[in-house]
């Protein structure tokens, strides 16, 4: 992975926020990164970007990932040496239908483990609420995929239930050019992968207030969750635009 990265022209934005995060973790608090996701090697990309200034931070991060990172032979190497909690995403949980119940049980057990980790504290967790990688639109522009309100709500509720101080931060990643995903989402394993060398970028924004945000006054729970997801998504999109200019 590292030989593909043009480190000289890569960048990290938001050092003051990352320093704040390191301080939270030292105190035994939890940090949850709500991030976009562009390539299967994002965990390695994060390490390459953070290790020089924040040694150990990326290494201790727990990545909530789709099951393909451990079932697709070509994806497995990208996740080796990472702390993973694997779940079945909504788009794959029904395929094949006869395995749906087993997949749901697996997801339930994974979320129970996540709750235990949050309760212990001192955890840094990466979550991509989109449930998948960013892709190009019809004009060939890479767009940050929409965030799932229910996914964000689930992690927020687990954090509150843990009763350990937990802080949420937006993270924007620009890694797409290194290993672009296929234009369409494939159900079957075996997508084509083409790599190229280039720069990568990461931004960590200010902590997110999960209770006070544009639309937090909405009384309908579902609509309020949508407003929060939209707000967090807009924060990540704004930081992402700053990375690619």
Spans of features found by a protein language model:
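Membrane-anchoring hydrophobic helices of lipid-metabolizing enzymes
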Residues: 1-31, 37-50, 58-59, 69, ...
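Short, flexible loop/turn elements at secondary-structure junctions
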Residues: 35-39, 65-70, 172-177, 206-208
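Short, well-ordered, mixed-charge alpha-helical segments that flank or form enzyme active sites
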Residues: 41-43, 70-74, 95-96, 134-137, ...
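Glycine-rich, phosphate-binding/catalytic loops in enzymes
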Residues: 48-52, 143-145
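Short helix-capping segments at alpha-helix termini
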Residues: 53-57, 163
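Active-site cradle of extracellular carbohydrate-active enzymes
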Residues: 65-109, 113-115
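Non-catalytic C-terminal accessory region of glycerolipid acyltransferases
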Residues: 100-245
């Amino acid at each position: 992975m590292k030989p593909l990265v043009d480190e000289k022209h890569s960048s990290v934005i938001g050092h003051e926020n990352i320093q704040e995060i390191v301080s939270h973790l030292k105190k035994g608090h939890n940090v949850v990164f709500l991030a976009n996701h562009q390539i299967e090697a994002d965990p390695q990309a994060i390490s390459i970007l953070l290790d020089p200034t924040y040694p150990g931070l990326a290494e201790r991060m727990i990545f909530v990932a789709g099951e393909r990172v451990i079932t697709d032979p070509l994806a497995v190497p990208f996740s080796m040496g990472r702390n993973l909690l694997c779940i079945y995403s909504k788009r794959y949980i029904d395929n094949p239908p006869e395995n749906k119940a087993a997949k749901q049980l697996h997801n339930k057990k994974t979320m129970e483990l996540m709750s235990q980790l949050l309760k212990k504290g001192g955890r840094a967790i990466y979550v991509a609420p989109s449930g998948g990688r960013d892709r190009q639109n019809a004009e060939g522009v890479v767009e940050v995929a929409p965030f799932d309100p229910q996914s964000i709500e689930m992690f927020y509720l687990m954090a509150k239930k843990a009763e350990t101080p937990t802080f949420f931060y937006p993270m924007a990643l620009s890694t797409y050019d290194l290993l672009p995903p296929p234009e369409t989402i494939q159900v079957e394993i075996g997508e084509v992968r083409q790599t190229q060398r280039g720069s990568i970028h990461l931004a960590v924004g200010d902590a997110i207030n999960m209770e006070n945000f544009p639309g937090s006054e909405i009384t309908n729970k579902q609509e309020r969750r949508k407003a929060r997801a939209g707000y967090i998504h807009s924060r990540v999109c704004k930081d992402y635009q700053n990375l690619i200019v």
